[in-house]
Amino acid sequence: LGNEENGRWSLRPSDEITRARRRYRDDTLILETELSCEKGVVRLIDFMPPRGEAPDVVRIVEGVEGTVPVKMSLSIRFDYGSIVPWVRRRKQGLLAIAGPDALFLATPVELVGRNLHTVADFEVSEGDRVPFVLTWYPSNRPPPERTDAEEALEDTASFWREWVTDCAHTGRFREPLVRSLITLKAL
């Protein structure tokens, strides 16, 4: 649907990626992507916590091996990519507003505006975890309480694992059945 000018959020090693592997954590809708490059390996953990008041997209960059330079690029667009929002820096993040919509990106990483995009360059070493939490809310209301990425990760995993306990099937097709059920529930 469109191109990066219509909106995009990229997190990746600055160096050339030599290997990429993706998987969902067992019985969850938490996506893990391992990206390898010459300097090491990073894991991206992507999910949406199941909370009703303000939808979040949470991304955690985890250092798995070595010290890896990472680049982030965020192009926020509303109305199917046709509206570029007004963007302001805030303490540990940024605020983007366009008409009735607002987004807050919370992260400890320093963010810079460049050519109508938000970018960041940082490094992660083995054991480091760098969170990014993007939250939507109506622009005529105050921002919702910030989501703690690590707490949201635990809560999201618990939510999905508890939800799939209702699936009584234990046969050889349990895994694809559960994956299908989770996908349908997410819709």
What is each stretch, according to the model?
Residues 1-187:
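Acidic, mature catalytic/reactive cores of soluble proteins
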